[in-house]
């Protein structure tokens, strides 16, 4: 069954947890699509895990379109949400709608995600009015890393906690079909989740959200130097890759790869003829 924005909204009333992962390429998307996963986020996190940037701020619309196209080719039943990158929507409502349209029309995304609370609700409403589904994103919003002074947990005092609750309500009122809650205390995420009728997708926001999302490289243990506290590792793919790469290099240098089983044959009479 194909996952849609309606699937997401209905899941909250059915009390069925939603599961999302990031993906940035065809191969990963194809594997995720074959699993029991509801949605794929083509996140601007690709700037860090694919392109090697220190944060997400350098990611462009062209980057997002390129990677989203690849994911769309690989995933047929999973809902695909694509991030609007930094400065693609902050400048004006027009830019927000235009760039959201590019992610749908050019890249094939089903929905878009943008960061921010009350200040971006006019963008959310305009994009939804253009018939493009929107996922909100509040809490630790990575595009605000410089304003926050780093990747810091949000909502830990009374005023900020109340602000996040109000932001969630305003995002719902603007027409979003879901909200990502990132880097906020578990009990606050529970209050937010119970305060709105659209599903919350948590990342570092505890177990009470309506669903969860992780960066797939993090949960597979691909990078030993990138390990946020909220990430549980379900594999050690980084170590497995190193072992495989080193085994390959060793066999090439020893002359044991490729062996007969991995080589093509030719009739000896042909060899004899061409070497006369």
From Swiss-Prot:
UniProt pathway annotation: Cofactor biosynthesis; (R)-pantothenate biosynthesis; (R)-pantoate from 3-methyl-2-oxobutanoate: step 1/2
Residues the entry annotates as binding Mg(2+): 44, 83, 115
Listed cofactors: Mg(2+)
Binding site for 3-methyl-2-oxobutanoate: 44-45, 83, 113
Function text: Catalyzes the reversible reaction in which hydroxymethyl group from 5,10-methylenetetrahydrofolate is transferred onto alpha-ketoisovalerate to form ketopantoate.
Protein family per UniProt: Belongs to the PanB family.
Annotated catalysed reactions: 3-methyl-2-oxobutanoate + (6R)-5,10-methylene-5,6,7,8-tetrahydrofolate + H2O = 2-dehydropantoate + (6S)-5,6,7,8-tetrahydrofolate
Name of this protein: 3-methyl-2-oxobutanoate hydroxymethyltransferase
Xref: Pfam families: Pantoate_transf
Subcellular location per the Swiss-Prot or TrEMBL entry: Cytoplasm
Annotated signal peptide: none
Gene3D superfamilies in the cross-refs: Phosphoenolpyruvate-binding domains
Active site: 182
NCBIfam families per UniProt: panB (TIGR00222), PRK00311.1 (NF001452)
Species: Clostridium acetobutylicum (strain ATCC 824 / DSM 792 / JCM 1419 / IAM 19013 / LMG 5710 / NBRC 13948 / NRRL B-527 / VKM B-1787 / 2291 / W)
Subunit structure: Homodecamer; pentamer of dimers.
UniProt keywords, alphabetically: Cytoplasm, Magnesium, Metal-binding, Pantothenate biosynthesis, Transferase
GO molecular-function term, one example from the UniProt record: magnesium ion binding
GO biological process: pantothenate biosynthetic process
Gene: panB
Chief location of this protein within or outside the cell: cytoplasm
EC numbers: 2.1.2.11
GO cellular component: cytoplasm
PANTHER family: 3-METHYL-2-OXOBUTANOATE HYDROXYMETHYLTRANSFERASE
Leading EC class: transferase
HAMAP family: PanB
Xref: InterPro entries: Pantoate_hydroxy_MeTrfase, Pyrv/PenolPyrv_kinase-like_dom, Pyrv_kinase-like_dom_sf
Entry's cofactor comment: Binds 1 Mg(2+) ion per subunit.
